[in-house]
Amino acid sequence: MKASSVVVALASLASAHYVFPSVTYNGKTTQDWEVVRKTTNYQSNGPVTDVTSQQMTCYQLAPGNEGATLLDVTAGSTIGAFRLAFTIRGKLADNQLFKGYNAKASVSHPGPVNFYMAKAPSGSITNFDGSGKVWFKIYNDGPTASTFISCSASLARVDIYAPGKTTLNVQIPRCLADGEYFLRVEHIALHSASSVGGAQLYISCAQLRVSGGTGTYKPNLMSFPGAYSPNDPGLVVNIYYPVPQNYKSPGGDPLVC
């Protein structure tokens, strides 16, 4: 099978707040909010800080799909190159990867990025809001001790995952059943996470139609909200001192087919 990729474009303000409004598949980038449900922070770029709130599902602006369409993808293909696209003074800068330029900066806050999926129970995602125990993790990439040490020592800018890293490849599990799914991307910024409610979560949900899956996976499902506790050690952590030597992202381990 020929590998194909989806790029989740991240737009960031100088404040390091950001949104995930578009994806790219087979080299073609969608318009903002074309296949991603518009989020509450589409103008403010602000985070979710209450993990018990309904915003944890898809951080959606309004009920319904806000006119978002479906993107057809193949199970086993790569959802690849999670890349950075910065917004400056509200205008898209020329270093956006989905404009064909490489990102020349990195997000300033360390923390894990998680990808989850949820299958629309009725077969159609149009009226699906992502509520209930329907979610499973397909990937997580988190900061290492060296990332935290770099941040602690100099308070300098560090990447989400590791210094210099601006891309992330994620595979749609081959063992999924065919159908319509949410792909939920979530970055957890930990720079202020030393107390409950300090972690900042940036969330979006794209709508995918998956085909070519084997249908053999029977996942253990979770809900958003519900999967995370405000006191989860993956959400309440002082990354500066003492520097964490081990960090585990909330939500458990990702799916392995």
Which ranges hold each PLM region?
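Short acidic/polar micro-motifs centered on Gly/Asp/Asn
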Residues: 171-172, 189
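Peripheral, solvent-exposed domain-edge segments
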Residues: 2-113, 117-167, 190-257
